[in-house]
Every structure is written in structure tokens, then in C-alpha cells.
Amino acid sequence: MIYRSTGRVDVGVSAIGLGGHEYLPDGRSRGFNENANLAVTPGYLYEGFGQEKRKAVLAAAYEHGINLLDATIDSEKEALGRNLSEMPPPYEVYVQTRPEGMVYSYDPHNARLARYDLLQAEVARGLDLLGRTRLDFLNLGFLQGALDHDPDYLRKVAEGLARLKREGLIRYACADTFSGEGTYLRQIEQDCFDGIFINLNFADDGAVGKVLPAAADRGMAVFAREAFMKGALFRMGEEAGIVDRNSLARTALKWVLSQRQVTAVMVGVDTPEQLASNVSVLDDPEMAAEELSILERVRETASYRDYVAGKREQFGQ
């Protein structure tokens, strides 16, 4: 395993992190694709999370030296906390999560994130689910509408994060958004975040131009997600006639890890074998001729071009 730190995140985190998603038989993630409203309802727990299949994935993560773990919804938080208690890791691990029902489009204007009393209570509730006394990475994903609605929004968020750190409830904070480049740059410029959590892949690379360099200039960690484009990568591969999904996935991961500002890439896997294939890219992280050829073949597909156009518009480019 490769470990990386930055000026603001002074612990070594594994270059590949493990996401908290568990999966339905058809490959879609659990929770959101069962009932999206219930998935983000604070306190709602789906049955069957954190069972033997997930424990096998977590055990494999330990074997590979993965120390960066992410949990999204309450079902994932509770399962991760339970599994870490049942299967204590052989080294220190770092956990990221987000306030339930307060981020992205789940709360109008993300107003509750800017109220310290509500944010503090939600962080404490999440810590109880995780069985931890301090959260390593608090992810705050708010949209541009929050900034437009409240000119003091970023100041309030910054003050709240500083208080959470002083009270020992969080160690680091990560900026996140789905509003694109301009919002990320304002989050970075506020100088209250220690890292960013961002969609990044070879078909959604808008952040490479300004956002990643801006984060790196401030010593922030860059945590990348969606290397596989929520499965769109494999549909592009089918169109290009690429039958080896593992090679396609490894190529996509290598592209992300080749961006010099990237600290870690988060992956979602269903089996230990999938995780082992993903981690194997670190044995030889340089792009080989065969992998460069795979990229070119995918880039020639209509589905790739359509995906790129949509993502560039979404990112504000």
C-alpha cells in the first residue's frame, strides 16, 4: 500500500480508500436504490448491512493496508461501527462520514449545516452510530444555493468547523459539492477545510484545471470518487468491445492516481476479489501501453462523448 499525507492532513492515508456502499444483486448500491427518502432519514437502518459478505471485504481491506474508510448513510455508519468493534483493525483507521439529511439536495439551502447546535448534535449522533469519540473526516457537501441564499454561509460553516475541532469532535473537514467548479473554489478559498471530496475520472476531469491545483496550493488533501462513473465506465467498455472489466477498472483507477494532486481514490466493491483487483494497480501505477490503448478505445465511443459533454456542463465549463 502507498500512504500519502498533505500539509493540512498530516496522517498517512492509503492511496485507495474503501467506500461504505453495499450492493443489490443487480449491482446497484443498497439504500439509495431501495428507497432514497428512507436512505437519508436520520435513524433509519436497513436490515442486512455489515453481515458476512461485508465483513469479508473489510478483512480484505485490512490485509491490503487500507486505512481510509467512508460511510454515507446511517445504515453504513452503524454497520461500520459494529464491524470495527467485531473485527478490530490491526492499525489505526480513519473514518469519513457526513451529516445525515443535511447535505447536497436533502436540506433546503443546506441551512442546518450553518447552525452549530444542529450540526454538533448530528456529528455526535453519527459518532454514536460509528462507536467513535472523534470523527477523522467530516464531509460537508453543500450546494451553490446555500451560498446564494445566505451571504454569511461560509463564515458560519467555518466557525462551526473550528468549534467542532476545539471540542474534539472532528479531526479534519472535507469540502464537497455537486454544484461545480465555482462552488469548490469558494470552499477552498474560505480556508476552513482540510481536504476536498470530488468526482474525478478520465471522462469527468473538469477539476484538473483549477480545483485540484487550488486545493494542493493550500495543502489540502484531494479524495477522488466515481472512478468507475457509477457503472457508466463498463457500458462504455462494452461499446468499445472491451470484455475484460478488471483491466478497464484498473485503467480508470490508474488515470485518477496519476493526477499528482490526488491523495486517495475511494472505491466501492462487492467482494474481496474486486478489492484485490483494484489494489493491484499500486503494484505498477504507471500507465502501460495496453492501458493507454484502452483509454483511447473508450474515448472513441459515443457514450463517452455524451458523458463528457454532460459532465462539463454540470461542472460549469
Per-segment meaning from a language model:
Residues 70-79, 102-105, 146-149, 201-207:
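Acidic-and-aromatic substrate-binding clefts and catalytic sites of carbohydrate-active enzymes
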